Swiss-Prot record:
The modification N6-(pyridoxal phosphate)lysine is found at K229. It comes from Acetivibrio thermocellus (strain ATCC 27405 / DSM 1237 / JCM 9322 / NBRC 103400 / NCIMB 10682 / NRRL B-4536 / VPI 7372) (Clostridium thermocellum). Disulfide bonds: none annotated. Its EC number is 2.1.2.1. GO terms for molecular function: glycine hydroxymethyltransferase activity; pyridoxal phosphate binding. The lineage of its organism: Bacteria, Bacillati, Bacillota, Clostridia, Eubacteriales. The record marks H228 as: Plays an important role in substrate specificity. Homodimer. (6S)-5,6,7,8-tetrahydrofolate binds at L120, G124, H125, L126, S352, P353, F354. It is found in: Cytoplasm. This is Serine hydroxymethyltransferase. GO terms for cellular component: cytosol. The gene is glyA.
Length: 412
């Protein structure tokens, strides 16, 4: 599919690396929960001369001339995003999910203000107040987490912390939480203490769009997301809000934290949003959830522990402590048999973030290839064989992975 002739002429080293990466994606089982395979149409949109165009500002209010056609594209992206999520306003310019989050912070907070966000080690995200992130350095961060007994969000703790610390902003949403999030409960708590509520749905946006997870738009003052992951668009960010906050959000994105938007990426966002609005996309999301539940159940049947005992969405966290293994080691041996996962901390993890006691597994990418429930049972068996009998099984597992990838070809 990919014609690298022009790149090969100018830079054969980069062309070769691209070819190797495409083949890696084709020939390995991709189980990283935050990764996905975009359509050829989305890839095509990103590779257009739209990358040549500067368009600081917003449609109809640009600081550069010659924006009449990129205005059409950005307006299409905006209107489609609003339709998908039922929002009054959408800003499609953030370059990433982290940029979308920082724009909301920039809009409503001053340095030193208090935010209440989910602890990274309990499933939150770097940009929700981690001390190593900008959000944790510029603001006073209070963290909530999950209950030790069931690894579910402790809404009583959230309420208690909110009343004690009176945050200006409460952040809901996660990067490694396999259960439904109660957005109404978060809004009730925010209202009790007079806080703004921001919900980051980067991981679950596709499920929300398909009606498979509650929509935070009716409850949150601000909703942020990436446009990749389950939404299966290009790498980028998106902010949704009501009309009353539209101007402050737009000003926070530009000129607040960004300059010129990436019009080739915004075009790809528009294309992917058109895909989201189809019946096929809804069916795809339904299959993601079916596959995740099947994979989770198959792993547990083999004696592999999952944090919270399963999943409601597209991902699961494997707790490896009962196997006496670390996430770092299991990520490595699975990669050796062509199965890609990421090491991940689990709640109350005794290991460091560089080692971890868990791995995170997701089904968006394998579902995009066309895999179904029976393939999840096979993948569970391959993971179990690798974890329990790596040296004796690795060649057989690699062959079974090869056969599975050939059955569901990618980017032909």
């Amino acid at each position: 599919m990919f014609n690298l002739n022009e790149i090969s002429k100018i830079d054969p080293e980069v062309a070769k690396a691209i070819e190797l990466e495409v083949n890696r994606q084709r020939n390995k089982i991709e189980l990283i929960a935050s990764e996905n395979f975009v359509s050829k149409a989305v890839i095509e949109a990103m590779g257009t001369p739209l990358t040549n165009k500067y368009a600081e500002g917003y449609p109809g209010k640009r600081y550069y001339g010659g924006c009449e056609f990129v205005d059409i594209i950005e307006n299409l992206a905006i209107e489609r995003a609003k339709k998908i999520f039922g929002a009054e306003h959408a800003n499609v310019q953030p370059h990433s999910g982290a940029q979308a989050n920082m724009a909301v912070f920039f809009a409503v907070l001053n340095p030193g203000d208090t935010i209440l966000g989910m602890n990274l080690s309990h499933g939150g995200h770097l940009s929700h107040g981690s001390p190593v992130n900008m959000s944790g350095k510029y603001y006073n961060v209070i963290s909530y987490g999950v209950r030790k007994e069931d690894c579910r969000i402790d809404y009583d703790e959230v309420r208690k912390l909110a009343k004690e610390h009176r945050p200006k902003l409460i952040v809901a949403g996660a990067s490694a939480y396999p259960r439904i999030i109660d957005f109404k409960a978060f809004r009730d708590i925010a209202d009790e203490v007079g806080a703004y509520l921001m919900v980051d749905i980067a991981h679950i946006a596709g499920l929300v769009a398909a009606g498979l997870h509650p929509n935070p738009v009716p409850y949150a003052h601000f909703v942020t997301t990436t446009t990749h992951k389950t939404l299966r668009g290009p790498r980028g960010g998106l902010i949704l809000c009501g009309n009353e906050h539209a101007k402050m959000i737009d000003k926070a994105v530009f000129p607040g934290i960004q300059g010129g938007p990436l019009m080739h990426v915004i075009a790809a966002k528009a294309v992917s949003f058109a895909e989201v609005l189809t019946d096929e996309f809804k069916q795809y999301q339904q299959q993601i959830v079916k596959n995740a539940k099947t994979l989770a159940n198959a792993l547990m049947e083999k004696g592999i522990d999952l944090v919270s005992g399963g999943t409601d969405n597209h991902l699961m966290l494997v707790d490896l402590r009962n196997k006496g293994l670390t996430g770092k080691y299991v990520q490595h041996i699975l990669d050796e048999v062509c199965i890609t996962v990421n090491k991940n901390g689990i709640p109350f993890d005794p290991e460091s973030p560089f080692v971890t006691s868990g791995i995170r597994i997701g089904t968006p990418a394998v579902t995009a290839r066309g895999m179904k429930e029976e393939d999840m049972v096979e993948i569970a068996d391959l993971i179990n064989l690798t974890i329990t009998d790596y040296e004796n099984s690795k060649e057989k597992v690699k062959e079974r992975v090869r056969m599975l990838c050939e059955k569901y070809p990618l980017y032909q």
